[in-house]
Amino acid sequence: MAIFKSISSISNSTGSMGSSISASNLDGIDSNNNSIACFDGGCGGSGLGGWSGFNGLDGIGGFNGGCSGGSNTNIINLDIDIGRRRHRRCC
């Protein structure tokens, strides 16, 4: 099995932000060479504070939970290649 990342709950509210990221089935880590997961969620007090990315997963993972820019919108950018399945961008 490949990497299975699930985002449980992301609440967009002023002051409180609770988001839990669980990664299971870590079996095909070596096959994933291009996996980028960036989580940037407005003002998160005690949510994603000290996460500095998974360096063991051969990819780039940046978790920014502090107040950056002071925006209330949650921007989630997911670009994860699972196994041999690659997303083709055309047109």
From Swiss-Prot:
InterPro entries: HssA/B-related. It comes from the Eukaryota. Pfam families: Coiled. Belongs to the UPF0512 family. This is UPF0512 protein F. It comes from Dictyostelium discoideum (Social amoeba).
